[in-house]
A protein has these predicted regions:
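N-terminal and secondary-structure boundary signal
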Residues: 2-350
C-alpha cells in the first residue's frame, strides 16, 4: 500500500558531503574540472568540426517552450519513495516510482497528447553501468517510454549527446536496450544533425543543437541526481548540456550563467529526476560504488528551478547561495528556489 502525505518530507543531507568550499578548494576543483573537460572533449570536438549544417544568413533563433498550461488542481512538485528498510534494489521498483510520480501529477496524458512527437532526454553521458549511478536508470527510461505510448504519442525518441563514446554509453548504461524494448526510437548523436541556434543568452550565444530537440512537440527531461566537481551538484538544468554539440568544456568558464541560459532556452514539458541511486561524491563521472547511495526515490514536476533546489538541498545541503544558477534562472521567471512554499505531493511506497 502506498501512503499519501501532502506535507514537505523531512530533508536530511549526508554527513560525508561538504557543501562549503575555501577559495583554495574552489581553485583546485576548477583545475580538476578542466581535466574532466579535456577528457570529455572528444565528443564535443568532433561535433564542433563536423556537426553544423551550412549556415543560413543568420542562425536560427527559437526559444523551445514545451510547457503545458498550469493547472492548480495538480502539484508542481511530487516525491515518490520507497521506505529504506535495509533491502537492496528490488525488481520493478524504478517502474513503480515513475508510475506513482506521474499519477500524483495527473498522469502522463496531462503532458503528452495524441500524435505528439516526444523526445526523452536521459543522462547517457558516461561509459558506466546502472549500478555506478552516472547515467539515468534504464528502468526509469523504459517506463517513461511506455507511459508516452499509452498517452497516444506518435513517436517516442530517446537521445543524448554523450561525453564518452556514444555507442559505449548507450549500450553500457542499459538505456539503449531498455528504451528499444519499450518501443522507443534510440538516436545516437550524428555529426550531420546539428543546427546552429541563436540562443540569445548572456554566456550562450550561437551554438550547435542536436536537431531532435528542435523538432519535438514535447520534451521530457530525465536527469539523474549526482555530485558535480565544479558546481556541487548536477541535476535537471545541467542535463541540457546534453543537447549541445561544439566544445562544451568552454561553457565551464561561465557555468552558472550557461546553465541559466540553457534553462531559458529549453523549457521542458516535464522533469522526472532519477534519485533511485545517486552519486554522492566524485561526480559527474563516478566509477566507485562506494560513492553511490541507494535512495529509492523519484522527484518530478513542472518547475525545473524548484525541482533542482529541492534535490540539491535534500542530498547535498546546497541552496541558491551555493548554486548561483538557481537564482539566475529564478530571476528570469523560470521557476522558484523557494520550493518550501509549493504544495508538494509525497508518496511512500512499500
Amino acid at each position: 500500500m502506498a501512503g499519501e502525505d501532502e506535507h514537505l518530507p523531512q530533508i536530511k543531507s549526508p554527513d560525508s558531503v561538504t557543501s562549503r568550499l575555501t577559495r583554495r578548494e574552489a581553485l583546485l576543483q576548477l583545475l580538476r574540472a578542466g581535466g574532466i573537460a579535456a577528457s570529455a572533449a572528444g565528443t564535443g570536438i568532433w561535433l564542433s568540426k563536423r556537426s553544423v549544417r551550412p549556415a543560413a544568413a543568420s542562425a536560427q533563433q527559437a526559444r523551445k517552450d514545451h510547457r503545458i498550461t498550469a493547472d492548480q488542481q495538480w502539484p508542481q512538485l511530487t516525491v515518490a519513495q520507497y521506505a529504506m528498510d535495509g533491502r537492496g534494489p528490488q525488481p520493478g521498483e524504478p517502474r513503480a516510482l515513475v508510475q506513482k510520480a506521474l499519477e500524483n501529477l495527473g498522469g502522463m496524458g496531462r503532458f503528452v497528447t495524441h500524435q505528439d512527437v516526444v523526445v526523452i532526454k536521459p543522462n547517457i553521458a558516461w561509459d558506466r553501468t546502472p549500478e555506478q549511478a552516472a547515467n539515468t536508470n534504464p528502468e526509469f527510461v523504459a517506463e517513461v517510454v511506455r507511459q508516452c505510448w499509452q498517452a497516444g504519442a506518435r513517436r517516442v525518441i530517446v537521445t543524448d549527446v554523450s561525453c564518452n563514446e556514444a555507442q559505449r554509453c548507450f549500450h553500457r548504461s542499459g538505456i539503449e536496450a531498455a528504451a528499444r524494448a519499450a518501443g522507443a526510437e534510440v538516436t545516437l548523436p550524428d555529426p550531420e544533425k546539428f543546427r546552429e541556434v541563436d540562443m540569445g543568452g548572456v554566456a550562450l550565444k550561437s551554438w550547435p543543437v542536436f536537431t531532435p530537440f528542435l523538432e519535438a512537440d514535447k520534451i521530457l527531461n530525465l536527469p539523474i541526481a549526482k555530485h558535480h566537481e565544479l558546481t556541487g551538484a548536477t541535476l535537471g538544468m545541467k542535463n541540457w548540456y546534453g543537447i549541445l554539440g561544439g566544445q562544451r568544456n568552454r561553457l565551464h568558464q561561465q557555468i552558472h550563467q550557461s546553465l541559466a541560459d540553457l534553462a531559458a532556452f529549453m523549457l521542458p514539458t516535464l522533469t522526472i529526476m532519477d534519485c533511485y541511486r545517486i552519486l554522492l561524491r566524485n561526480g559527474p563521472t563516478g566509477g566507485n560504488l562506494e560513492d553511490v547511495a541507494l535512495k529509492k526515490t523519484v522527484v518530478a514536476g513542472t518547475d525545473p528551478v524548484a525541482l533542482d533546489a529541492y534535490v540539491a538541498k535534500a542530498y547535498w545541503d546546497l541552496d541558491a547561495e551555493h548554486l548561483p544558477y538557481l537564482r539566475l534562472a529564478a530571476n528570469r521567471g523560470l521557476g522558484t528556489v523557494e520550493f518550501e512554499k509549493l504544495a508538494i505531493k509525497t508518496s511512500q511506497l512499500s
